[in-house]
Amino acid sequence: MQEGKISQIIGPVVDVDFPEGQLPSILDALTITRPDGSRLVLETQQHLGEERVRTVAMESTDGLIRGLSVANTGRPIQAPVGEGVLGRMLNVVGDPIDGRGPVNATKTYSIHRSAPKFEDLSTKAEMFETGIKVIDLLEPYSRGGKTGLFGGAGVGKTVLIMELINNIAKQQSGYSVFAGVGERTREGNDLWHEMMESGVIDKTALVFGQMNEPPGARARVALTGLSIAEYFRDEEHRDVLLFIDNIFRFTQAGSEVSALLGRMPSAVGYQPTLATEMGELQDRITSTKNGSVTSVQAIYVPADDLTDPAPATAFAHLDATTVLSRQIAELGIYPAVDPLDSTSRILDPNVIGDDHYDTAQSVKQILQRYKDLQDIIAILGMDELSDEDKLVVARARKVQRFLSQPFFVAEAFTGLAGKYVKLEDSIKGFKEIIAGKHDNLPEGAFYLVGTIEEAIEKAKTL
């Protein structure tokens, strides 16, 4: 194992000198044993001349001094994989952070891997039920597909991801991997305790590199989580779920690292390699003939601007998008999904069937008509509308409220029991509202209920 010496430390960037001809390869992991015995991992990023490499640290560089000895491992960062990581919480380099002793994983995978070969990819399209009405009806997720949850600050991305983990892990009993990338540590802590209580933890591996970590860890932790998921797909031939919260922080960390390495910034100050980095990550999240990785990624939208380069680059890779809207959150409708802005590639009668497709289209039409009429209502009031339009508005408002739903993970906030709504129940409910079967019920009956039967029961109490 070749040894080098630290020559310079600038925040999370560390320069290391090696003897001539012994430079580590790009992306190789280097390790430093600190004076207190703890291990710090660096990742090689640049070669500066014949004898020096520039590296990025995966943890805080506090307490490092020039001249400390650095060992070259000769390979990229290795993540522990397999059944041993289920029920455990790891950091970016695969060390446990849950205080429950060492991880007993026999195999490791490099966090930098090539995407599956073109001929190994699977192309079949099938829907994947989440139990959330607005998603299953209007932007169905595909098994083995990639879904993005877009939203500004505080509109409910993390709550929606936690609900999806809860529903899918309970209903489908598959393995899940959760990568927490640059988000709040408190939310990770909540997720951990909730999973412990619900018993879902035994089928889930959690990997965290949160807001307080240096950019190196935040830029790599998504890859660690992905490697764990790839093992289950490729070696155990399973269908795995990969949750990433938040993919924007992956880009943000990449931008910090890029600036620290002295690269010229590109549009809006992002790194010039933005599209490449995103592509390398997203291309590995895919389904092969062996198994599938279905991913749900929360994507923070800076200043609610969907044209910002970070969310715009992520858009290109996704099969379905769920856009969370502040206007809908302000109406008190949760999940605050914008039914007209969200899309899905499999919203196609050949995949989901005519009944589902026609219902989804009629819901979108009635909501779009209501949106068009809102300007007239704001200026002239409801009385100026034709009888036909008044009926459209009344039904659209019921549809809008029926798109809300009480969540299991939000029971503490809403005081209502969570609901898992089967797809056929969703379709039936929306068809009946649009057909006018429930024109006699008040709007409030449709707010925060599961099935249409619950709305009818609720109407009796109003």
UniProtKB/Swiss-Prot annotation:
Query: Keyword S-adenosyl-L-methionine on this protein?
Result: no
Keywords, in A-Z order: ATP synthesis, ATP-binding, Cell inner membrane, Cell membrane, CF(1), Hydrogen ion transport, Ion transport, Membrane, Nucleotide-binding, Translocase, Transport
Q: Which residues bind ATP?
A: G151, G152, A153, G154, V155, G156, K157, T158
Reactions catalysed, semicolon-separated, are: ATP + H2O + 4 H(+)(in) = ADP + phosphate + 5 H(+)(out)
Please give, as recorded in its UniProt entry, the membrane topology of this protein.
Answer: Peripheral membrane protein
Q: What compartments host this protein?
A: Cell inner membrane
**Signal peptide stretch:** none
Primary localisation category:
membrane
- Select a single GO molecular function from the record's annotations and give it: ATP hydrolysis activity
Q: Which family does it belong to?
A: Belongs to the ATPase alpha/beta chains family.
What function does this protein fulfil?
A: Produces ATP from ADP in the presence of a proton gradient across the membrane. The catalytic sites are hosted primarily by the beta subunits.
By its UniProt entry, which HAMAP family does this protein fall under? ATP_synth_beta_bact (MF_01347)
How does this polypeptide assemble, per the annotation?
A: F-type ATPases have 2 components, CF(1) - the catalytic core - and CF(0) - the membrane proton channel. CF(1) has five subunits: alpha(3), beta(3), gamma(1), delta(1), epsilon(1). CF(0) has four main subunits: a(1), b(1), b'(1) and c(9-12).
Q: What is this protein called?
A: ATP synthase subunit beta 1
The record lists the lineage as:
Bacteria, Pseudomonadati, Chlorobiota, Chlorobiia, Chlorobiales
Query: Gene name?
Result: atpD1
